[in-house]
Amino acid sequence: MKREYDVLVVGGGPGGAFAAKTFAEKGYSVLLTEKRPAIGAPVRCAEGVGKALMHEFFKPEDRWVAAEIEKANIIAPDGFKMELEPEKAGAEVGYVLHRKVFDRDLVWMAAGAGADIQVKTRAVTPIMEDGAVKGAILNQGGIAQEVRAGLTIAADGVESKFARWCGVDTTVPLREMETCAQYLMTGIDIDAHATEFYVGNNIAPGGYVWIFPKGDKTANVGIGVGGDRCKPGNRPIDYLNRFVARNFPNGKTIELIAGGVSICQPLPCTVANNLMIVGDAARVSDPLTGGGIYAALYTGKLAGDVGSKAIEKGDTSTQALMPYDETWRASYLGKALERNYQIKEVFVKLNDDDLNAIVHSVSKMNLSDFNTLNLIKNIIAANPKLAIKLGKAGLKSLLDSF
């Protein structure tokens, strides 16, 4: 490990790996550090990503894909199942990934482009001089080493300690942190090409249960619950255990993971002097679904593109890096995050009668272009009483602006 690089990337997830790859491909010296001993492990993700969004960056390798998803089912609190066939779910179909394989391949791409990689290496303290980040003190195997860099990328996930240590307020209110638990299960009767989502305040208050297939009779079965709704006996794992007991009593659990997903608005600013923040660290996971793979890839690559130009000009100040922040906010990603946050704020307050009405009404719709925006607009049109509630929350006028 050298003592000086053009770029230091803190975090080896998709955002950090794609940023490192982009910088390295442009000829800059890059060090990517990952605090865990292995890239991609442990997995803390449902592993789903939209097909069109993934293809924006590359054609997935076969070894990345656990299952190709052709349709989605949404199950209401009363048990009614709405099936979205491929012709309706076109914008929502995609892949369930093997994240361990996918993440490692992304880091290998970065290494192949010339980036140095160090695992089990923690950035424990940023080097701050005159209000600017100048690198970090890294701890590897109990040995501390100072590594200086002209530009640092904070890609350290939802915890995002590094950005906070650099003076960026990354605090997430409890009500805007989805607490999650997930089993990898086998021996369960599922549709291997359909995702399923269960909603309801007795099933997953402030969130939902998901079933993401990963092969024959195998799936990620997980839950997200609003952080402010967790109580003794009603933790995410408690809700999940009850769900599994009802639906998969003979299933076998292979793995358990737990973690958190921010469902808040993005950070007010994702750059500082010599610092760029990407992926979950920037709070760009989807506040409605919790998905974050696409956002990590997009912001990681964009950081590499904008940051490279700033380095070339010899100016990595906040102002020089601001095009990164402005570009992603003006993009499809930024607009979707804004819209979905407002939708989430309304939907977490709906009772089960409202949720039943929504799922039943959607099942009767003929949506030739199914996506979140069209879905919500059609729900409002089909449910006059619900439209009044959503209108009072300001959601209808927001949707009309998109």
Curated annotation (Swiss-Prot):
Known function: Is involved in the reduction of 2,3-digeranylgeranylglycerophospholipids (unsaturated archaeols) into 2,3-diphytanylglycerophospholipids (saturated archaeols) in the biosynthesis of archaeal membrane lipids. Catalyzes the formation of archaetidic acid (2,3-di-O-phytanyl-sn-glyceryl phosphate) from 2,3-di-O-geranylgeranylglyceryl phosphate (DGGGP) via the hydrogenation of each double bond of the isoprenoid chains.
| GO biological process annotation, one example | glycerophospholipid biosynthetic process
A UniProt-annotated Pfam family:
FAD_oxidored
| The family this protein is said to belong to | Belongs to the geranylgeranyl reductase family. DGGGPL reductase subfamily.
- Put simply, this protein is called Digeranylgeranylglycerophospholipid reductase
UniProt cross-references to HAMAP family, sorted A to Z: DGGGPL_reductase (MF_01287)
Q: Which reaction does it catalyse?
A: a 2,3-bis-O-phytanyl-sn-glycerol 1-phospholipid + 8 oxidized 2[4Fe-4S]-[ferredoxin] = a 2,3-bis-O-(geranylgeranyl)-sn-glycerol 1-phospholipid + 8 reduced 2[4Fe-4S]-[ferredoxin] + 16 H(+); 2,3-bis-O-(phytanyl)-sn-glycerol 1-phosphate + 8 oxidized 2[4Fe-4S]-[ferredoxin] = 2,3-bis-O-(geranylgeranyl)-sn-glycerol 1-phosphate + 8 reduced 2[4Fe-4S]-[ferredoxin] + 16 H(+); a 2,3-bis-O-phytanyl-sn-glycerol 1-phospholipid + 8 A = a 2,3-bis-O-(geranylgeranyl)-sn-glycerol 1-phospholipid + 8 AH2; CDP-2,3-bis-O-(geranylgeranyl)-sn-glycerol + 8 AH2 = CDP-2,3-bis-O-(phytanyl)-sn-glycerol + 8 A
Pathway stated in the Swiss-Prot or TrEMBL entry:
Membrane lipid metabolism; glycerophospholipid metabolism
Keyword annotations of the record? FAD, Flavoprotein, Lipid biosynthesis, Lipid metabolism, Oxidoreductase, Phospholipid biosynthesis, Phospholipid metabolism
For activity, the cofactor(s) needed are: FAD
> Any signal peptide, and if so, which residues?
none
User: Per its UniProt record, what InterPro entries does this chain match?
Assistant: DGGGPL_reductase, FAD/NAD-bd_sf, Geranylgeranyl_Rdtase_fam, Geranylgeranyl_reductase, GGR_cat
The terms describing its cellular component in GO are:
membrane
Q: What is its EC number?
A: 1.3.7.11
Positions of FAD binding: 15, 34, 45-46, 48, 99, 123, 280, 292-293
Q: Which GO terms describe its molecular function?
A: flavin adenine dinucleotide binding; geranylgeranyl reductase activity; oxidoreductase activity, acting on the CH-CH group of donors, iron-sulfur protein as acceptor; oxidoreductase activity, acting on the CH-CH group of donors, NAD or NADP as acceptor
State the Gene3D superfamilies in the record.
Answer: D-Amino Acid Oxidase, subunit A, domain 2, FAD/NAD(P)-binding domain
Remaining remarks:
Reduction reaction proceeds via syn addition of hydrogen for double bonds.
Record bears the keyword rRNA-binding = no
Tell me the cofactor note. Answer: Binds 1 FAD per subunit.
